[in-house]
């Protein structure tokens, strides 16, 4: 469905000005059956991006604003006694949708975060001994305000590892901001967003991405990159096996969006930092040297030899 992908990209670019590289990465994560962490200051388009995706991809959308008083049952749902029927019935929580916007996830308790964790990993919730599966496709887009903002706390490593990628929207450049201001004088492009692909077509796209071929040389390259993060002197926690699998899945989605049925090293390189950066725990020496995870990962990309792959 190359034409459908192109139309999705065009519509996202029309709604989110000047952020095609970021919206493309988010679209790749959806195609790769992954979850997305958006780390940024308020007001740069995180919520609009999630809403646009849900409308363009025909997904049922829910949003939960994480605050200290949000409890696990708000996320997973709960059982309630029905006096008329004399039975307990399940009342769905926020996760019973196709696309969940988990807003300001680092403002809530660790217990509530853990409730979301099970759903992200397993695609189901357990309430009072009963298991309930979420609809397919299922994607969580979580937003996180910068650590140090009022009321925020660090997400645990186990939670961060569940997100396929982490990206930052950033402020728009000057021309994109002018375009946004001009467009919003007339209408909000989001209000006129129409479905480009149905939920069934999204599932088919995900299946096609899964079938993209990855040569052994590329898998070997991915393994070398992962090992380099674990052996780097400035990194105390490198890329986990789950993270390494996520890297392969994102590389497949990158190849698919470039209309290729096989992965090349450039696909891996293009998504490596988005997959790995939020999973890294840096040594104190890195902080002393004022090096970020992305800067160190760029050095790793430069150091690890790229394999020759026949196209």
Whereabouts are the PLM-identified features?
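P-loop (Walker A) phosphate-binding loop of NTP-binding proteins
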Residues: 41, 75, 143
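Pre-Walker A (pre-P-loop) alpha-helix and adjacent loop at the N terminus of AAA/AAA+ ATPase modules
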Residues: 2-44
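AAA+ P-loop NTPase domains with strong preference for DNA replication initiators
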Residues: 175, 182-263, 288
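Walker A/P-loop
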Residues: 30-67
């Amino acid at each position: 469905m190359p034409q459908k992908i192109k139309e999705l990209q065009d519509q996202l670019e029309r709604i989110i000005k000047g952020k095609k590289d970021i919206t493309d990465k988010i679209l790749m994560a959806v195609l790769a059956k992954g979850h997305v962490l958006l780390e940024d200051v308020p007001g740069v388009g995180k919520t609009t991006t999630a809403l646009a995706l849900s409308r363009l991809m025909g997904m049922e959308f829910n949003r939960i604003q994480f605050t200290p008083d949000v409890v696990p049952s708000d996320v997973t749902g709960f059982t309630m006694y029905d006096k008329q029927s004399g039975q307990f019935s399940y009342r769905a929580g926020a996760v019973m949708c196709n696309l969940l916007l988990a807003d300001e996830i680092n403002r809530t308790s660790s217990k509530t975060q853990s409730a979301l964790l099970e759903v992200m990993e397993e695609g189901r919730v357990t309430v009072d001994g009963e298991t309930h599966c979420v609809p397919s496709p299922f994607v969580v887009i979580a937003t996180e305000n910068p650590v140090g903002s009022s009321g925020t706390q660090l997400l645990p490593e186990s939670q961060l590892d569940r997100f396929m990628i982490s990206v930052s929207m950033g402020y728009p450049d000057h021309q994109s901001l002018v375009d946004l201001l001009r467009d919003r004088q007339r209408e909000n492009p989001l209000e006129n967003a129409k479905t480009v692909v149905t939920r069934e077509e999204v599932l088919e796209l995900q299946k096609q991405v899964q079938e993209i071929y990855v040569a052994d040389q590329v898998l070997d390259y991915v393994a070398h990159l992962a090992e380099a993060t674990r052996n780097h002197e400035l990194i105390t926690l490198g890329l986990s096996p789950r993270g390494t699998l996520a890297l392969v899945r994102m590389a497949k989605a990158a190849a698919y969006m470039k209309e290729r049925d096989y992965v090349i090293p450039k696909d891996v390189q293009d998504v490596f930092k988005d997959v790995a950066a939020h999973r890294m725990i840096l040594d104190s020496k890195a902080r002393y040297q004022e090096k970020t995870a992305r800067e160190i990962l760029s050095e790793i990309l430069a150091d690890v030899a790229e394999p020759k792959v026949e196209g």
